[in-house]
């Protein structure tokens, strides 16, 4: 059985104004991942995601590339203990 965990990621590059958060939400819902994504004042996007480990790996791989019009320069990740979220929200 795949364990459940959470991760916090910070994504920098051209990641605001390119539908990054909305695209992340769509994929997260497909992968049954909960959490949230928000823009930061410094131009980065912060993502907090919880789900099965294999699904989080797939999601993280996508975060490193982003949607079509994005350019990801750096994507950092911190694994965190499981938290029970119901949905994935764009903040």
Swiss-Prot record:
Transmembrane segments annotated in the record for this chain: none
UniProt-listed Pfam families: Acylphosphatase (PF00708)
Active-site feature positions: 21, 39
Keywords for this protein: Hydrolase
The protein's Enzyme Commission number: 3.6.1.7
InterPro entries assigned: Acylphosphatase, Acylphosphatase-like_dom, Acylphosphatase-like_dom_sf, Acylphosphatase_CS
Protein's UniProt name: Acylphosphatase
Provenance organism: Legionella pneumophila subsp. pneumophila (strain Philadelphia 1 / ATCC 33152 / DSM 7513)
Taxonomic classification: Bacteria, Pseudomonadati, Pseudomonadota, Gammaproteobacteria, Legionellales
């Amino acid at each position: 059985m795949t364990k459940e965990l959470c991760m916090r990621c910070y994504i920098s590059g051209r990641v605001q104004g390119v539908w990054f958060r909305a695209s992340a939400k769509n994929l997260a819902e497909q992968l049954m991942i909960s959490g949230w994504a928000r823009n930061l004042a410094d131009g980065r996007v912060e993502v907090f995601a919880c789900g099965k480990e294999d699904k989080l790996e797939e999601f993280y791989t996508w975060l490193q590339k982003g949607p079509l019009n994005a350019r990801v320069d750096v994507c950092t990740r911190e694994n965190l203990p499981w938290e029970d979220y119901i949905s994935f929200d764009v903040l």
